[in-house]
Amino acid sequence: MVSSCCGSVCSDQGCSQDLCQETCCRPSCCQTTCCRTTCYRPSCCVSSCCRPQCCQSVCCQPTCCRPTCCETTCCHPRCCISSCCRPSCCMSSCCKPQCCQSVCCQPTCCRPSCCRPCCCLRPVCGRVSCHTTCYRPTCVISTCPRPLCCASSCC
């Protein structure tokens, strides 16, 4: 019965909750009704199955990087899209320009593209937040005017 659920019937009509077994977790079976705890499998991670309850660590695939999937367990480098800019996603591999929010101003986020005024909040230069890659004109504000921050692009 479960095997037959993993065919066109499941793809067209979806599986009932009691039929969502591990053997039924195939891309064609990832309909709304199939997003249950037994269906959190990598093979189920398709765009049509990216529901909030399906955002487990095994489901962090490129096709599953959706705003509703932006949870702590889904903060993998491949999930760092603009809609995934959350505090829990602030890791070095996730430091993209669109992720440079004030909540993302961490030492690992000091990249040239991340040097925005909201990231220049520490007055003492030479500490972890004052990397050479962050010495940009946009970083020269009253709270970060020390000589150590005056790189050629900042003068």
Curated annotation (Swiss-Prot):
Expressed in the hair follicles. It holds the Pfam family Keratin_B2_2. GO terms for cellular component: cytosol; keratin filament. Signal peptide: none annotated. Sequence repeats lie at residues 5-9, 24-28, 29-33, 34-38, 44-48, 49-53, 54-58, 59-63, 64-68, 69-73, 74-78, 79-83, 84-88, 89-93, 94-98, 99-103, 104-108, 109-113, 114-118, 119-123. The keyword Transcription does not apply. Keywords: Keratin, Repeat. Residues 5-123 are annotated as: 20 X 5 AA repeats of C-C-[GIKRQVHEML]-[SPTRV]-[STVQRCP]. The keyword Repeat applies. It comes from the Eukaryota. InterPro entries: KAP (IPR002494). GO terms for biological process: hair cycle. In the hair cortex, hair keratin intermediate filaments are embedded in an interfilamentous matrix, consisting of hair keratin-associated proteins (KRTAP), which are essential for the formation of a rigid and resistant hair shaft through their extensive disulfide bond cross-linking with abundant cysteine residues of hair keratins. The matrix proteins include the high-sulfur and high-glycine-tyrosine keratins. Belongs to the KRTAP type 4 family. Interacts with hair keratins. This is Keratin-associated protein 4-7.
